[in-house]
Amino acid sequence: MASTRLPGKPLADIAGEPMIVHVWRRATEAGVGPVVVACAEPEIAAAISAAGGQAVMTRPDHPSGSDRIFEALESVDRESAHDAVINLQGDLPTIDPAIVRAVLRPLADPGVDIATLVAPITEAKECYDPNVVKAALSL
């Protein structure tokens, strides 16, 4: 919600629904298991609930999304029944559900503990933009 470039971004209206609801729908359409939105803002939880989804409120002071997910897991998966978690950012309203499924494929290898989706940088200016996340790969 505290985006400096677009304050309130998760609730930005896209075709009559908040952005976060579009992301939740894409994740649900992937069919990979339960989808829970971890959030610190009651407005986000209310939007997800109104759409029929499940949201878990977390502390607002987490330094990362991974920390927020860990807190949410402590309440929704107390028995550690799930062996994988997908950390899907709330600002990807058009993500293809097939991409969500694809991130699980590497985890079928017992030697793999984590998988991250990346895409090639297509414009030179993105190389120097601090708002574009980069990944170093060895292929």
What is the meaning of each model-derived region?
Residues 1, 39, 89, 118-119:
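Short beta-strand/turn micro-motifs composed of small residues
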